[in-house]
Amino acid sequence: MKHTSEPTSQPDTQAAESAQSSAAAAGQAASAYSSQAQRASADAQAIAGDEAAVAEATIEPDTAELRRQLEAADEKARQNYENWARAVAEGENIRRRAQDDVARAHKFAIEGFAEYLLPVMDSLQAALADASGDVAKLREGVELTLKQLNAAFEKGRVTELNPVGEKFDPHRHQAISMVPADQEANTVVNVLQRGYTLADRVLRPALVTVAAPK
């Protein structure tokens, strides 16, 4: 009987060794990749941290600047409001003073002129109290009173209108009639009642007769 020899398992052993070698290499590669991934993650975190720090450092000055600008704007607004309030108060005070001045002017407008007339009143009362019957003395008193009245008119800027020989002015004269006369037409011939002006305003026009056209 012939004995047959069993086939050897060398190829299987080589395959197993090759597989083990490949697995080891794969494990080493995976480990290396994992290390690289960890380093990359750490680097990324470091970079992110740096960027966050930079951003925070950038934002902080911007926030401080904005806060400073806001405070400056608030202060400016407060000053503007105070200035406006003072201007309004000053304007109101000026308006009230003006109203008071106008009221006083209306109330006491004639005060000065009335003071000028007081001596005239004194002279008239003295004349009435004189019972002597002296006509010459009475005339003298009337003349003195008239001078006092003219002085009061002058101080009060009251001017007499006695336009004899002047051209007729409808703004200052009132014609009663037209009469034949040697004067040029529309010339005042006679004054029946004298007129008066206060400054440039006519208090009373003069009553006159006017020369008729020839």
Swiss-Prot record:
GO terms for biological process: protein folding. Residues 1-61 are annotated as: Disordered. InterPro entries: GrpE, GrpE_coiled_coil, GrpE_head. It is found in: Cytoplasm. Its main location: cytoplasm. Keywords: Chaperone, Cytoplasm, Stress response. Gene3D superfamilies: 3.90.20.20, Head domain of nucleotide exchange factor GrpE. Residues 14-57 have a biased composition (Low complexity). One of its GO terms (molecular function) is protein-folding chaperone binding. GO terms for cellular component: cytosol. CDD domains: GrpE. Residues 1-13 have a biased composition (Polar residues). Participates actively in the response to hyperosmotic and heat shock by preventing the aggregation of stress-denatured proteins, in association with DnaK and GrpE. It is the nucleotide exchange factor for DnaK and may function as a thermosensor. Unfolded proteins bind initially to DnaJ; upon interaction with the DnaJ-bound protein, DnaK hydrolyzes its bound ATP, resulting in the formation of a stable complex. GrpE releases ADP from DnaK; ATP binding to DnaK triggers the release of the substrate protein, thus completing the reaction cycle. Belongs to the GrpE family. Homodimer. This is Protein GrpE. It comes from Ralstonia nicotianae (strain ATCC BAA-1114 / GMI1000) (Ralstonia solanacearum). The gene is grpE.
